């Protein structure tokens, strides 16, 4: 995923937390902030040390980034997304992570209307 699609700075995370809307399920919390002037979406990831050691946390982040990469045609542009992983994610495989992310993105309005993501895992 290219650098322009990532949220890295603390100030940017804080802005999304404070001004954005949150949606959650048992595995993820997603904060969404509209940025109409931005022709693409950006994502920021937050995976706490409570979820496991570095290997586990990095695997979770890879899974989430890969999901966004595969779903990029269906994800609404002009938004910033901050994804916070919760405890159950540590034991999930890629297909389960993707299904859960699609669910919470749909709930948050992050998927384009009528966009049916392919369920190939």
From Swiss-Prot:
PANTHER family: RIBONUCLEASE P PROTEIN COMPONENT (PTHR33992:SF1). Signal peptide: none annotated. It comes from Geobacillus kaustophilus (strain HTA426). Its EC number is 3.1.26.5. One of its GO terms (biological process) is tRNA 5'-leader removal. It holds the Pfam family Ribonuclease_P. Belongs to the RnpA family. The keyword Ribonucleoprotein does not apply. Consists of a catalytic RNA component (M1 or rnpB) and a protein subunit. Gene3D superfamilies: 3.30.230.10. GO terms for molecular function: 3'-tRNA processing endoribonuclease activity; ribonuclease P activity; tRNA binding. GO terms for cellular component: ribonuclease P complex. InterPro entries: Ribosomal_Su5_D2-typ_SF, Ribsml_uS5_D2-typ_fold_subgr, RNase_P, RNase_P_CS. It catalyses: Endonucleolytic cleavage of RNA, removing 5'-extranucleotides from tRNA precursor. RNaseP catalyzes the removal of the 5'-leader sequence from pre-tRNA to produce the mature 5'-terminus. It can also cleave other RNA substrates such as 4.5S RNA. The protein component plays an auxiliary but essential role in vivo by binding to the 5'-leader sequence and broadening the substrate specificity of the ribozyme. This is Ribonuclease P protein component. Keywords: Endonuclease, Hydrolase, Nuclease, RNA-binding, tRNA processing.
């Amino acid at each position: 995923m290219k650098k322009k699609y990532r949220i890295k700075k603390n100030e940017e995370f804080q802005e999304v937390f404070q001004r954005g809307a949150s949606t959650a399920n048992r595995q993820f919390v997603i904060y969404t902030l509209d940025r109409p002037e931005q022709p693409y979406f950006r994502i920021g990831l937050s995976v706490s040390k409570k979820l496991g050691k570095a290997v586990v946390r990095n695997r979770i982040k890879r899974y989430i980034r890969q999901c966004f990469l595969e779903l990029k045609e269906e994800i609404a542009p002009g938004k910033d997304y901050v994804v916070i992983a919760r405890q159950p994610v540590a034991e999930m495989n890629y297909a389960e992570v993707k299904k859960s992310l699609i669910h919470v993105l749909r709930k948050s309005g992050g998927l384009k209307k009528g966009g049916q993501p392919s369920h190939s895992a």
